[in-house]
């Protein structure tokens, strides 16, 4: 394995947002040196999983004998699962990305899982994605319900380190979006909230404004899972990670802690902008918006909502683009940039680095 890099020995959090065009691939290295992967997008030019396999995974703390503590697929659209094959190996468990927590919107139809079932007739994907969808179904058919976050069992704790998943049961999403199949598929998205100290991040996948409002309102069929990496909190709430009960609501988290980093819903497109989300935040806007998207070359690509790119959509942070410091309201992968964000957990502001070469980003934290 070689010399353990500096980043693997710190109590900071590192969030990688990879340039995969119109798709999503995010990796969180928590302050406890555990890994959470959110979505498996890729591009013709870059494989996030190959980069992670070489540079990050060997140095992570194992969770239940797995190098990646949790893999999350927000929803089963092709641009979010193009590298799903990395989770599959001949014996089923040899992949370095194999996790004891494979997490996705439910698609089981038997017994107690039936109220969680996805309507696959309404999931629309482009031709050529059939193999990835089959792998998705095969892989997740064997996972253990209920949907969970990490079960905190460590002897180590980090103050104010926590994260949660929020989602709506698929049959309720079908009621919210009873006619538009694309909105139904996007509305299934699992939302991930991460907090370390005063720094916070929300990853909402491709969730629609209507579904996001339902989550914020705590409407029927809304589920939440939450892990606080603290022994006392864990003992006081032993089932926060696997049952919906008195976990904090997403709206209360946003109101109490604010939002440092918002990964824009649905690649920042105008159709995904949520006024309810902004009204729920402390100060009514995040510090910075991240847009994971490709360069728009035709009218069918849609338009990025201009509010994300101005002081109306964020308060702004100083970011390092290559070697140049700039104040930005939003950052994007569209110009070929990968993004690395550091939460120190002890104050200050998040550090944000952009570079076309992820190896150069790695040197920032080694």
PLM ranges: what are they?
Residues 1-15, 20-21, 55-70, 81-226, ...:
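Flexible, acidic/histidine-containing loops and adjacent segments that form or flank the divalent-metal
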Residues 67-79, 262-266:
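Metallo-beta-lactamase
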Residues 25, 33, 51-57:
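N-terminal cofactor/phosphate-binding cores enriched in small/glycine residues
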Residues 16, 36-38, 72, 201-203, ...:
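Residue-level marker for buried hydrophobic side chains located in beta-strands
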